[in-house]
UniProtKB/Swiss-Prot annotation:
GO MF annotation list: ATP binding; magnesium ion binding; shikimate kinase activity
Listed name of the protein: Shikimate kinase 2
Binding annotation for ATP: G12, C13, G14, K15, T16, T17, R120, Q155
Family assignment from sequence similarity: Belongs to the shikimate kinase family. AroL subfamily.
Length: 173
């Protein structure tokens, strides 16, 4: 197995944490699309959104996805990467898509516990628990539709990595 592995899911589901660990376990490279955009634009996600709006950010996000996708690479995507049908198709066709699924309450709890990880501006301006419930309601079908494997992200990062590795082994058999 050498195809890229794309991690999708809402903010706080563990894409970056699990992606790093999975890359180490597999001997793959690791790239986070948000971090890649920050490095290539010299702007934070919030700055890009402030200057170019969400539409401009989503365009940059799609370009970043195409630039970083390579064999033997784990790609942690932004939570909204699945909003563009072209991104879903690209990930599904080019690699293996892992959806890290967690409920809105757990996502909100994680984001509140680690506010430094919450670099992306709020989508709605409402409390994070309400926003995460709305985001999941709008995106759940997109995440599942793009995914080759759905993994329970309420586990510890180590347990999630084990679950992903098991799913990858089963699909390769």
């Amino acid at each position: 197995m050498t195809h890229p592995i794309f991690m999708v899911g809402a903010r706080g589901c563990g894409k970056t944490t699990v992606g790093h660990q999975l890359a180490q376990a597999l001997g793959y490279d690791f790239v986070d699309t948000d971090l890649f955009m920050q490095q290539t634009t010299n702007m934070t996600v919030a700055d890009v959104v402030a200057q170019e709006g969400w539409h401009g950010f989503r365009q940059r996000e799609s370009l970043a996805l195409q630039q970083v996708a390579s064999n033997r690479c784990i790609v942690a995507t932004g939570g909204g990467m699945v909003l563009a049908e072209a991104n879903r198709r690209f990930m599904h066709d080019k690699g293996i898509v892992i959806y890290l699924h967690a409920d809105a309450e757990l996502l909100a709890q994680r984001l509140e516990e680690n506010p430094q990880d919450n670099q992306r501006p709020t989508l709605t301006g409402r409390p994070i628990a309400e926003e995460m419930a709305d985001v999941l309601a709008a995106r759940e079908a997109l995440y599942r539709g793009a995914a080759h494997h759905v993994i329970d992200a309420s586990q510890t990062p180590d347990a999630i990595v084990v679950s992903v590795l098991k799913a990858l082994r089963l699909s390769a058999a």
